[in-house]
């Protein structure tokens, strides 16, 4: 692999890791969006496997409340597993272009809603069954499109978690989604072979960027974090919508 290609990979994953460290999501989208400017999409996708999985696990384990969050969110994880393995919608998968655009618009609208200081109502006493429903719907969308964020991310934000607990909850959801999606692809025979060695090269800058983003989050106030979180959702949604339409 040429030096300039390695440099591009390092810079892209450093940036993508920093964003993920700060707001808890966005690494695959940012990395794919930038890498495909310099290489084929298949090559870019092969680089994502190790950094995406490892940064999700790191995000999960470094948080302060793994046990309490696991006990609270197990219905969401159970629903996510069932939805991913059994609820994939062929119609969505066949129309993945417009589906990604629609999901992007949902994130944009939710981000604007959050910046306007409006909030989704907390689920309250309905949290257990609502978590299962949201998990199932997220699993269906994940199986059909490979997108983990809708509707899980808006729902987790509605639980009124602290910034560190929210980041850890996102890591829990994304890690589970990655594992179950991989299992679903393996079972259906659609899991493609990737070069783990090449993918591992991208892990170092991704972790370095993530560490920097985590430091920035630690020194942020809750208010500043929420602003960055919603702006990040808008940017992520805008990219998804644009890539779906163009």
Model-derived features with residue positions:
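Structural signature of hydrophobic alpha-helical transmembrane segments
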Residues: 5-6, 35-53, 97-107, 136-146, ...
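Hydrophobic residues within alpha-helical transmembrane segments
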Residues: 11, 15, 50-57, 74, ...
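Signature of the 12-TM Major Facilitator Superfamily
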Residues: 43-50, 101, 168, 172, ...
């Amino acid at each position: 692999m040429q030096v300039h290609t390695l440099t591009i990979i390092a810079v892209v994953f450093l940036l993508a890791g920093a964003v993920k460290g700060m707001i808890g999501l966005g690494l695959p989208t940012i990395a794919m969006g930038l890498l495909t400017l310099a290489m084929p999409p298949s090559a870019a996708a092969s680089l994502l496997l190790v950094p995406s999985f490892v940064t999700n696990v790191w995000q999960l384990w470094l948080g302060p409340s793994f046990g309490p969050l696991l006990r609270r969110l197990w219905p969401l994880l159970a629903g996510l597993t069932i939805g991913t393995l059994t609820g994939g919608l062929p119609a969505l998968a066949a129309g993945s272009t417009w589906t990604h655009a629609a999901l992007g618009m949902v994130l944009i609208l939710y981000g604007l809603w959050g910046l306007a200081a409006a909030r989704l109502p907390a689920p309250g006493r309905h949290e257990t069954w609502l978590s299962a429903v949201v998990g199932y719907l997220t699993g269906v969308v994940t199986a059909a499109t490979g997108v983990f964020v809708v509707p899980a991310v808006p729902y987790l934000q509605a639980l009124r978690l602290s910034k560190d607990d929210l980041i850890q909850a996102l890591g829990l959801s994304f890690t589970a989604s990655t594992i179950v999606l991989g299992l679903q692809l393996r079972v259906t025979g659609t899991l493609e072979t990737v070069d783990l060695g090449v993918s591992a090269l991208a892990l170092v800058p991704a972790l370095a960027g993530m560490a920097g983003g985590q430091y920035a989050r630690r020194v942020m106030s809750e208010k500043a974090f929420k602003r960055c979180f919603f702006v990040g959702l808008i940017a992520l949604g805008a990219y998804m919508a644009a890539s779906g339409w163009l």
